[in-house]
Amino acid sequence: MQWSYRFVSGLLVLASIVGMTFALYLEHFKGLEPCPLCIFQRVGLMAMGIVALIAFLHNPVSNAFKRVYAFLATLGILWSVGVAIRHVWLQTLPPDQVPSCGPGLNYLLDALPLKTVLQQVLQGSGECAAIHWTFLGQSLPVWSLAYFSLILLVCVWQLLRRYPVIVTKKK
Protein backbone atom coordinates (compact mmCIF):
# COMPACT_ATOMS: atom_id res chain seq x y z
CA MET A 1 0.00 0.00 0.00
CA GLN A 2 1.35 3.41 -0.99
CA TRP A 3 0.54 6.07 1.60
CA SER A 4 -0.18 9.41 0.01
CA TYR A 5 1.71 12.52 1.01
CA ARG A 6 -1.51 14.04 2.29
CA PHE A 7 -2.33 10.99 4.43
CA VAL A 8 1.09 11.03 6.11
CA SER A 9 0.83 14.80 6.65
CA GLY A 10 -2.53 14.20 8.30
CA LEU A 11 -0.97 11.57 10.56
CA LEU A 12 1.72 14.07 11.57
CA VAL A 13 -0.94 16.68 12.38
CA LEU A 14 -2.75 14.07 14.47
CA ALA A 15 0.50 13.15 16.26
CA SER A 16 1.05 16.81 17.11
CA ILE A 17 -2.50 17.18 18.42
CA VAL A 18 -2.22 14.01 20.52
CA GLY A 19 1.13 15.10 21.98
CA MET A 20 -0.08 18.60 22.83
CA THR A 21 -3.37 17.29 24.25
CA PHE A 22 -1.49 14.92 26.55
CA ALA A 23 0.91 17.69 27.64
CA LEU A 24 -1.98 20.04 28.40
CA TYR A 25 -3.85 17.25 30.22
CA LEU A 26 -0.83 16.65 32.47
CA GLU A 27 -0.50 20.38 33.06
CA HIS A 28 -4.11 21.36 33.70
CA PHE A 29 -5.66 18.19 35.13
CA LYS A 30 -2.73 16.48 36.84
CA GLY A 31 -1.06 19.68 38.05
CA LEU A 32 2.36 19.12 36.46
CA GLU A 33 3.93 22.52 35.80
CA PRO A 34 6.05 22.41 32.63
CA CYS A 35 9.69 23.41 33.05
CA PRO A 36 11.33 25.65 30.41
CA LEU A 37 12.73 22.63 28.53
CA CYS A 38 9.25 21.06 28.42
CA ILE A 39 7.89 24.26 26.91
CA PHE A 40 10.66 24.30 24.30
CA GLN A 41 9.82 20.70 23.38
CA ARG A 42 6.21 21.73 22.87
CA VAL A 43 7.31 24.54 20.55
CA GLY A 44 9.06 22.08 18.23
CA LEU A 45 6.08 19.72 18.27
CA MET A 46 3.69 22.57 17.45
CA ALA A 47 5.98 23.84 14.67
CA MET A 48 6.03 20.38 13.10
CA GLY A 49 2.25 20.14 13.46
CA ILE A 50 1.65 23.54 11.86
CA VAL A 51 3.91 22.73 8.90
CA ALA A 52 2.20 19.34 8.51
CA LEU A 53 -1.22 21.03 8.64
CA ILE A 54 -0.22 23.49 5.92
CA ALA A 55 1.14 20.59 3.84
CA PHE A 56 -2.09 18.66 4.41
CA LEU A 57 -4.26 21.60 3.35
CA HIS A 58 -2.05 22.55 0.40
CA ASN A 59 -1.62 18.95 -0.76
CA PRO A 60 1.21 19.92 -3.13
CA VAL A 61 1.58 18.26 -6.49
CA SER A 62 5.15 19.46 -6.90
CA ASN A 63 7.78 17.18 -5.38
CA ALA A 64 9.80 20.29 -4.50
CA PHE A 65 7.00 21.60 -2.27
CA LYS A 66 6.60 18.16 -0.70
CA ARG A 67 10.30 18.13 0.18
CA VAL A 68 10.23 21.69 1.55
CA TYR A 69 7.28 20.90 3.83
CA ALA A 70 8.87 17.64 4.95
CA PHE A 71 12.19 19.39 5.61
CA LEU A 72 10.53 22.11 7.71
CA ALA A 73 8.51 19.53 9.67
CA THR A 74 11.70 17.56 10.25
CA LEU A 75 13.45 20.67 11.58
CA GLY A 76 10.59 21.32 14.00
CA ILE A 77 10.54 17.84 15.48
CA LEU A 78 14.34 17.64 15.42
CA TRP A 79 14.31 20.65 17.76
CA SER A 80 12.03 18.71 20.15
CA VAL A 81 14.26 15.63 19.96
CA GLY A 82 17.37 17.69 20.73
CA VAL A 83 15.76 19.45 23.69
CA ALA A 84 14.38 16.13 24.99
CA ILE A 85 17.87 14.59 24.81
CA ARG A 86 19.21 17.51 26.84
CA HIS A 87 16.35 17.12 29.31
CA VAL A 88 16.98 13.39 29.80
CA TRP A 89 20.70 14.10 30.24
CA LEU A 90 19.96 16.69 32.96
CA GLN A 91 17.80 14.16 34.77
CA THR A 92 20.60 11.60 34.79
CA LEU A 93 23.15 13.95 36.36
CA PRO A 94 24.30 13.25 39.92
CA PRO A 95 22.54 15.62 42.37
CA ASP A 96 25.72 17.62 43.03
CA GLN A 97 26.10 18.42 39.31
CA VAL A 98 22.54 19.61 38.67
CA PRO A 99 22.43 23.34 37.81
CA SER A 100 20.69 25.57 40.34
CA CYS A 101 17.12 26.65 39.73
CA GLY A 102 16.79 29.96 37.96
CA PRO A 103 13.88 32.32 37.42
CA GLY A 104 10.82 31.20 35.47
CA LEU A 105 10.57 31.37 31.69
CA ASN A 106 8.08 34.26 31.77
CA TYR A 107 10.48 36.40 33.79
CA LEU A 108 13.40 35.53 31.52
CA LEU A 109 11.41 36.48 28.40
CA ASP A 110 10.41 39.81 29.97
CA ALA A 111 13.84 40.72 31.32
CA LEU A 112 16.42 39.36 28.87
CA PRO A 113 17.13 39.32 25.13
CA LEU A 114 15.86 36.21 23.32
CA LYS A 115 19.38 34.90 22.61
CA THR A 116 20.24 34.99 26.32
CA VAL A 117 16.95 33.31 27.22
CA LEU A 118 17.65 30.48 24.76
CA GLN A 119 21.15 29.99 26.17
CA GLN A 120 19.95 29.93 29.77
CA VAL A 121 17.01 27.62 29.14
CA LEU A 122 19.06 25.15 27.11
CA GLN A 123 21.65 25.09 29.88
CA GLY A 124 18.87 23.75 32.06
CA SER A 125 18.07 24.31 35.68
CA GLY A 126 17.27 22.34 38.79
CA GLU A 127 13.57 22.32 38.02
CA CYS A 128 14.31 20.59 34.70
CA ALA A 129 16.29 17.86 36.47
CA ALA A 130 13.49 17.00 38.90
CA ILE A 131 11.42 13.92 38.06
CA HIS A 132 7.77 14.49 38.99
CA TRP A 133 6.05 11.82 36.90
CA THR A 134 7.00 8.34 35.72
CA PHE A 135 5.35 5.62 33.70
CA LEU A 136 6.80 2.11 33.59
CA GLY A 137 9.83 3.45 35.44
CA GLN A 138 10.66 6.14 32.88
CA SER A 139 10.31 9.90 33.27
CA LEU A 140 8.19 12.12 31.06
CA PRO A 141 11.22 13.45 29.10
CA VAL A 142 12.21 9.85 28.25
CA TRP A 143 8.71 9.13 26.94
CA SER A 144 8.69 12.44 25.10
CA LEU A 145 12.02 11.57 23.49
CA ALA A 146 10.64 8.21 22.34
CA TYR A 147 7.50 9.86 20.92
CA PHE A 148 9.43 12.63 19.19
CA SER A 149 11.91 10.10 17.77
CA LEU A 150 9.06 8.10 16.24
CA ILE A 151 7.63 11.28 14.70
CA LEU A 152 11.13 12.21 13.47
CA LEU A 153 11.41 8.87 11.67
CA VAL A 154 8.11 9.54 9.88
CA CYS A 155 9.22 13.07 8.95
CA VAL A 156 12.56 11.84 7.59
CA TRP A 157 10.78 9.08 5.66
CA GLN A 158 8.40 11.72 4.24
CA LEU A 159 11.46 13.79 3.26
CA LEU A 160 13.47 11.00 1.62
CA ARG A 161 10.86 8.72 0.07
CA ARG A 162 10.28 8.55 -3.67
CA TYR A 163 7.21 10.24 -5.01
CA PRO A 164 5.63 9.26 -8.30
CA VAL A 165 6.40 11.67 -11.09
CA ILE A 166 3.23 13.31 -12.32
CA VAL A 167 3.31 14.03 -16.02
CA THR A 168 1.03 16.78 -17.22
CA LYS A 169 -0.06 17.06 -20.82
CA LYS A 170 0.59 20.32 -22.61
CA LYS A 171 -2.41 21.91 -24.25
Curated annotation (Swiss-Prot):
Residues 1-8, 61-67, 162-171 are cytoplasmic. The keyword Methyltransferase does not apply. Keywords: Cell inner membrane, Cell membrane, Chaperone, Disulfide bond, Electron transport, Membrane, Oxidoreductase, Redox-active center, Transmembrane, Transmembrane helix, Transport. Disulfide bonds join C35-C38, C101-C128. It is a multi-pass membrane protein. One of its GO terms (biological process) is protein folding. One of its GO terms (cellular component) is plasma membrane. Its main location: membrane. GO terms for molecular function: electron transfer activity; protein-disulfide reductase activity. Residues 26-43, 86-142 are periplasmic. It comes from the Bacteria. The chain crosses the membrane at residues 9-25, 44-60, 68-85, 143-161. It is found in: Cell inner membrane. Belongs to the DsbB family. PANTHER family: DISULFIDE BOND FORMATION PROTEIN B (PTHR36570:SF3). Required for disulfide bond formation in some periplasmic proteins. Acts by oxidizing the DsbA protein. HAMAP family: DsbB. This is Disulfide bond formation protein B. It comes from Acinetobacter baylyi (strain ATCC 33305 / BD413 / ADP1).
